[in-house]
């Protein structure tokens, strides 16, 4: 299982530093938060606040699904384990994807300034695969929810 809301919050948390850097015209946009240690710290913060953000959003989405007679799309509140896994997956995958594209990334800092992933996958291809895999994930989720909903009716 994965909490898409928590995963999304983790992505937002990771990009706060680059946003501040862009607004301040900084030379380095991907600093301490774009390291493995920084990602672990942000994941912990996200995992701690996510339940308070997820509950009202899920409650509203589930109400709307019921009102539209799409109750089979309803989602339960994620467990603590799912929240933590989603936050970690969100921040660590962010590090990997950004490391392919950004020369100012040092994912292993403070232990190493190396970025062995830089340039391994072309910039546009990273976005292409994110789109394709996101689409596959969304379709898989939708089909599995539909099949489970049909099974419950039978």
Regions found by a protein language model. Name each.
Residues 1-154:
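N-terminal membrane-targeting hydrophobic helices
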């Amino acid at each position: 299982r994965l909490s898409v809301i928590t995963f999304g919050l983790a992505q937002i948390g990771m990009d706060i530093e680059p946003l501040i850097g862009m607004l301040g015209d900084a030379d380095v946009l991907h600093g301490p938060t774009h390291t493995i240690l920084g990602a672990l710290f942000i994941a912990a913060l996200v995992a701690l606040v996510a339940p308070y953000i997820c509950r009202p959003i899920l409650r509203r989405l589930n109400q709307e699904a019921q009102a539209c007679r799409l109750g089979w799309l309803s989602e339960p509140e994620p467990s603590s384990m799912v929240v933590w896994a989603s936050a970690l997956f969100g921040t660590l995958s962010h590090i990997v994807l950004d490391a392919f594209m950004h020369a100012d990334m040092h994912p292993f800092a403070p232990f190493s300034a190396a970025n062995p992933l830089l340039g391994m996958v072309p910039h546009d291809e990273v976005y292409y695969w994110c789109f394709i895999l996101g689409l596959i994930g969304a379709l898989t989720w939708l089909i599995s929810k539909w099949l489970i909903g049909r099974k419950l009716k039978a």
